[in-house]
C-alpha cells in the first residue's frame, strides 16, 4: 500500500497518541498536511493533551500549529528570545509578532 507523506504523518501521530505516553514530542508534525487537515490534527493533539496528565512539546515553524500552546518559546540562533502564550507574545510585538504577521498576512487581524 502506498501512502502520501501527509498520510504517513497522520498514521505516525495516531500511533503516538494511542500509546498514551507521559511525554509527546511533535517535531514539525503537520508540515506535510494541508491547512484543513492540520487544524483537525492540531485539535486532536490539543484535546488529548488537555484530557490527560502528560507533557506535549510541539516544534514548528508554522505558527498556527502552536498558537494554542500554554507556553511558547521563540528561538533565534539557538537561544530563547521570547516566551509566553500566543496573545502575550503578540502584545510584545517582538520576533513572534513579526513572524505571525509574515505568516498570516499584513491585512488580517493579529489575534485569531
Where are the regions that the model predicts?
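ABC-family ATPase nucleotide-binding domain "signature/switch" substructure
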Residues: 1-92
Amino acid at each position: 500500500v502506498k501512502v502520501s507523506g501527509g498520510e504517513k504523518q497522520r498514521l505516525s501521530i495516531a500511533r503516538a497518541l494511542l500509546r498514551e505516553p507521559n511525554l509527546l514530542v511533535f517535531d514539525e508534525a503537520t508540515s506535510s498536511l494541508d491547512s484543513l487537515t492540520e487544524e483537525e490534527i492540531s485539535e486532536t493533539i490539543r484535546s488529548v493533551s488537555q484530557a490527560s496528565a502528560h507533557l506535549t512539546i510541539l516544534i514548528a515553524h508554522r505558527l498556527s500549529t502552536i498558537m494554542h500552546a500554554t507556553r511558547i518559546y521563540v528561538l533565534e540562533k539557538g537561544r530563547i528570545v521570547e516566551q509566553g502564550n500566543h496573545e502575550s507574545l503578540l502584545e510584545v510585538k517582538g520576533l513572534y509578532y513579526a513572524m505571525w504577521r509574515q505568516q498570516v498576512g499584513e491585512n488580517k487581524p493579529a489575534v485569531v
